[in-house]
């Protein structure tokens, strides 16, 4: 206890030495170091923020390894598109369940610090097993690796958000979430543009292409997961130290999951779920498969196709915080969701039925993808009571992962049997169903008072009137 008090005193500007004498004012360099070591100081929290951002970098970098190496995986492992897409399906399957229990495990079982470390270990182990599957030419081992990777990936994102809430409050929090999302998109972008180049370098070193080259490339990519694990360990130490010095509680997700709440979900909430699933199944499986489409239809090189494929994430990185601020300032969530879905539909139609430069469609897709996330997910909080938020978001993520798992397999089957045109028509149908759900949501919500489409000013007025 005396050591804790001494450490806390040492961080104060007027800290005293062992004899209780006043110490001299520290020089500028010493003052800066003191600020970095003080958990209550902004400089220290910025260090923590940097670690938080890199905590999920490895997971997002490695998630789309299959998309970046689509040609190489199918050729070296001698699998068709249906089997290739199982690498995405196996990631999603565990998260159909874990979306409900990730927060519970962090709050009640492991705690935020151990939970983050354990989920980071799952991500690392999963990526290593995935790479070993390539080295030993065992596709089933690659599937197992993706399953283990999936167990850690989504739950690690929950832990990342929990740390953010624990260290940052109020308006700071929106910026922190925006920065974390931007870093995630940077991870995906770097993967799309780096892994193909890395494969060619490994191929040159080993003398030939093949499953061994693929496995070694994936193993090198796994270094990013080790970086994330190091960040998890550093965060655990700094969080424990801050708890000891500032006497603050360990961060918790605050989620309360009650599956019985599902029966009370309103029609607008179910429509939001349908919009979410039908929209995202036309984004992530599409990104996983579209690289070969760009080389076959438009004649791009493999590296150029990767660059086009990554533009969705490139745009999302800076635009997500900007669109988040825009939606916060204007309100009108349904209108913004409608704009995002219509733009996405236009992008898929362009890619399917025209020979226009695909950069146009993919840039539009990047903008609409960023806008939808900022406008759709906050709407859940407007249609369910606060005590049901954990269940609602858990259920939304669960059926999203279920949809991604099923549609990934279906998309692979369509591509194997019918080709890219039919696949694009399938994605257009999914987005059209999402668009129909947005229109229905607008009509239902309008009949119930229209709170989802209030302007920001009207929401503030309603909030003030309720407080009075």
Swiss-Prot record:
Motif (Dileucine internalization motif) on chain: 11-12
Subunit composition and interactions: Homodimer. Interacts with lysosomal protein GLMP (via lumenal domain); the interaction starts while both proteins are still in the endoplasmic reticulum and is required for stabilization of MFSD1 in lysosomes but has no direct effect on its targeting to lysosomes or transporter activity.
GO cellular component: lysosomal membrane; lysosome
Domain notes per entry: The dileucine internalization motif is required for lysosomal localization.
Transmembrane segments: 42-62, 86-106, 116-136, 138-158, 173-194, 218-238, 270-290, 307-327, 334-354, 364-384, 395-415, 421-441
Organism: Bos taurus
Membrane topology (UniProt): Multi-pass membrane protein
Entry similarity comment: Belongs to the major facilitator superfamily.
Region (Disordered): 1-25
Localization of this protein: Lysosome membrane
PANTHER family documented for this protein: MAJOR FACILITATOR SUPERFAMILY DOMAIN-CONTAINING PROTEIN 1
GO BP: dipeptide transmembrane transport from lysosomal lumen to cytosol; protein localization to lysosome; protein stabilization
UniProt keyword list: Lysosome, Membrane, Transmembrane, Transmembrane helix, Transport
Entry protein name: Lysosomal dipeptide transporter MFSD1
SUPFAM superfamilies xref list: MFS general substrate transporter
Gene3D superfamilies, per database record: MFS general substrate transporter like domains
Catalytic function, reaction form: L-alpha-aminoacyl-L-arginine(out) = L-alpha-aminoacyl-L-arginine(in); L-arginyl-L-alpha-amino acid(out) = L-arginyl-L-alpha-amino acid(in); L-arginyl-glycine(out) = L-arginyl-glycine(in); L-alpha-aminoacyl-L-lysine(out) = L-alpha-aminoacyl-L-lysine(in)
């Amino acid at each position: 206890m005396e050591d804790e008090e001494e450490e806390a005193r040492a961080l104060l500007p007027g800290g005293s030495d062992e004899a209780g004498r006043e110490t001299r004012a520290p020089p500028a360099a010493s003052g800066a170091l003191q600020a970095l070591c003080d958990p209550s100081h902004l400089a220290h929290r910025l260090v923590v923020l940097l670690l938080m951002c890199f905590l999920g970098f490895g997971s997002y970098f490695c998630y789309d390894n299959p998309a970046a190496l689509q040609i190489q995986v199918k050729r070296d492992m001698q699998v068709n598109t249906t089997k290739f897409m199982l690498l995405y399906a196996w990631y999603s399957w565990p998260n159909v369940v874990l979306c409900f229990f990730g927060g519970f495990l962090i709050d009640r079982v492991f705690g935020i610090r151990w939970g983050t470390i354990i989920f980071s270990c799952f991500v690392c182990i999963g990526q290593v097993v995935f790479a070993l599957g390539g080295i030993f030419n065992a596709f089933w081992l690659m599937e197992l690796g993706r399953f283990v990777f999936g167990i850690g990936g989504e739950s690690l994102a929950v832990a990342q958000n929990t740390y953010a809430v624990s260290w940052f409050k109020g308006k700071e929090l929106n910026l922190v979430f925006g920065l974390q999302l931007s870093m995630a998109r940077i991870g995906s972008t770097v993967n799309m543009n780096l892994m193909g180049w890395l494969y060619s370098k490994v191929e040159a070193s080993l003398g030939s292409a093949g499953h061994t080259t693929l496995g070694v490339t994936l193993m090198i990519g796994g270094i990013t997961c080790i970086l994330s694990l190091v960040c998890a360990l550093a965060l655990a130490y700094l969080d424990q130290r801050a708890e000891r010095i500032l006497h603050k509680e360990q961060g918790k997700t605050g989620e309360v999951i009650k599956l019985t709440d599902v029966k009370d979900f309103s029609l607008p909430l179910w429509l939001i779920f349908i919009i979410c699933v039908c929209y995202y199944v036309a984004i992530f499986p599409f990104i996983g498969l579209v690289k070969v489409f760009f080389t076959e239809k438009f004649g791009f090189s493999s590296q150029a196709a990767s660059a086009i494929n990554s533009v969705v994430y490139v745009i999302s990185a800076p635009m997500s915080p900007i669109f988040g601020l825009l939606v916060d300032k204007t309100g009108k969530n349904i209108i913004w969701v409608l704009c995002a879905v219509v733009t996405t539909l236009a992008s898929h139609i362009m890619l399917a039925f025209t020979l226009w430069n695909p950069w146009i469609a993919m840039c539009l897709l990047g903008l609409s993808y960023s806008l939808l996330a900022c406008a759709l997910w906050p709407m859940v909080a407007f249609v369910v009571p606060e005590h049901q938020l954990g269940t609602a978001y858990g259920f939304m993520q669960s059926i999203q992962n279920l949809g991604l798992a099923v549609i990934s397999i279906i998309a692979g089957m369509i591509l194997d049997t019918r080709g890219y045109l039919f696949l694009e028509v399938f994605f257009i149908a999914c987005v059209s169903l999402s668009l129909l759900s947005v229109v229905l949501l607008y009509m239902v919500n309008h009949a119930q008072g229209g709170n989802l489409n209030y302007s920001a000013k009207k929401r503030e007025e309603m909030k003030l009137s309720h407080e009075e």
